[in-house]
């Protein structure tokens, strides 16, 4: 697996994005992702759940659905909404997770792209 090519592709994404392997290890990360979280990402060591949730276990072992596990089971892209621990406190994120295959169809890892969810006020304006 050529991480430098994957890193270049991750860098081309404007939204926070990472490339992770089936063991949850982050192997490529873009600057918007680094800017989102307080903890430093150490490629080849940091795990996605450690950075985004500050958990020692994957999401599905901590009460949330795990998009990586869902991708592994279905073999297809998936989206989930998570509450992440960001630089600015808790923030809801829409997560797109897509499997990345080699030319033989084998899964190399997973592309995760985040979109912060902005909520409108539930109260009608007065005035």
Question: What do the predicted segments below correspond to?
Answer:
Residues 83-88, 101:
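PAS-family sensory domains
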Residues 81, 92-95, 111:
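PAS/PAC sensory module
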Residues 1-34:
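Sensory modules in modular signal-transduction proteins
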Residues 34-53:
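PAS and related sensory helical modules
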Residues 51-83:
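Terminal output helix/cap of sensory domains in signal transduction proteins
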Residues 100-127:
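Sensory coupling linkers of modular signal transduction proteins
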């Amino acid at each position: 697996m050529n991480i430098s090519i994957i890193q270049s592709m991750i860098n081309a994404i404007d939204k926070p994005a990472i490339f992770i392997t089936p063991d949850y290890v982050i192997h490529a990360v873009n600057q918007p992702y680094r800017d989102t979280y307080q903890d430093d990402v150490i490629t080849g060591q940091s795990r996605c759940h450690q950075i985004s949730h500050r958990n020692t276990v994957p999401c599905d072992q901590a009460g949330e659905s795990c998009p990586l596990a869902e991708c592994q089971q279905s073999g297809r892209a998936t989206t989930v909404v998570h509450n992440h621990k960001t630089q600015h406190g808790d923030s809801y994120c829409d997560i797109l997770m897509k499997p990345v295959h080699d030319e033989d169809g084998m899964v190399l890892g997973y592309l995760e792209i985040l979109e912060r969810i902005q909520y409108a006020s539930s109260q009608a304006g007065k005035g």
